[in-house]
């Protein structure tokens, strides 16, 4: 692959990312679709920052709508998203909408929405379980 092709692909990816960021700011809608991972956590946290603190506008901001469909994932990343949502709710409402399935780590993210603004679809499955951990092997 030549450097020119790589530069063109990077430029196209950058333009697409900028377009998505711009549209996201206008419609104030985010989504967590799939597993809660470090990459998705980073995207959601940065999105929340862009729609609140970094937007350059003064609070109160228009509400943010967050769609969630996940089997769960990393508890550490979930708590990062939860903490940022808690901070963002000081400046605007966050409307959470469960679609399809909201399970495990996704349930706390769904519950982190503004009271009275948390919804699930008619056919959405929600599952929560106790947290446990363990280790195996010699110490």
What are these regions (language model features)?
Residues 1-139:
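Terminal-region recognition feature
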């Amino acid at each position: 692959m030549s450097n020119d092709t790589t530069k063109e692909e990077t430029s196209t990816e950058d333009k697409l990312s900028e377009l998505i960021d711009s549209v996201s700011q206008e419609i104030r809608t985010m989504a967590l679709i799939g597993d809660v991972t470090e990459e998705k956590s980073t995207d959601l946290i940065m999105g929340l920052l862009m729609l609140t603190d970094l937007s350059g506008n003064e609070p109160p901001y228009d509400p943010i709508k967050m769609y969630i469909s996940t089997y769960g994932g990393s508890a550490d990343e979930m708590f990062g998203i939860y903490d940022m949502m808690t901070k963002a709710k000081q400046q605007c409402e966050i409307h959470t909408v469960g679609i399809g399935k909201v399970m495990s780590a996704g349930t706390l993210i769904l519950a982190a929405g503004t009271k009275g603004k948390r919804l699930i679809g008619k056919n959405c499955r929600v599952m929560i379980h106790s947290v446990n951990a363990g280790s195996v092997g010699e110490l």
